[in-house]
């Protein structure tokens, strides 16, 4: 956690650079939800909001402390999808949320 998490900002995609991505952060949220740690999962999902643009899409990454978006202007479908899956895993809003529950394999 200490290597990759930038508290309140997100999850780094590499350990030695000061940038976080919404997708890495959402994927970490999914992992926490899958093991039942919904508090941390919710915090991580909240951290992705800094990446959200006015049109609802998500910038791929943010460099800190400069707040530069990288790659410049990039808003990928996989980033939005990761955020949606994390939200669903936490809230169980759709049947797909069961994919991330520890009991899914037993169903």
Question: Across the structure, where does each feature detected by a protein language model lie?
Answer:
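Extended glycan-interaction surfaces of carbohydrate-active proteins
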Residues: 1-20, 43, 49-107
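Generic helix N-cap/helix-start motif at coil->alpha-helix transitions
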Residues: 21-25
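Alpha-helical positions within canonical tetratricopeptide repeat
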Residues: 39-40
């Amino acid at each position: 956690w200490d290597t990759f998490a930038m508290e309140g900002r997100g999850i780094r995609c590499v350990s030695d650079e000061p940038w976080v991505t919404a997708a890495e952060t959402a994927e970490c949220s999914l992992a926490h939800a899958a093991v039942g740690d919904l508090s941390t999962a919710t915090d991580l999902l909240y951290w992705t909001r800094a990446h959200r643009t006015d049109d609802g899409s998500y910038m791929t990454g943010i460099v800190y402390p400069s707040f530069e978006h990288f790659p410049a202007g990039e808003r990928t479908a996989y980033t939005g999808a990761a955020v949606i899956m994390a939200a669903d895993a936490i809230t169980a809003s759709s049947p797909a949320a069961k994919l991330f529950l520890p009991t899914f394999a037993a169903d």
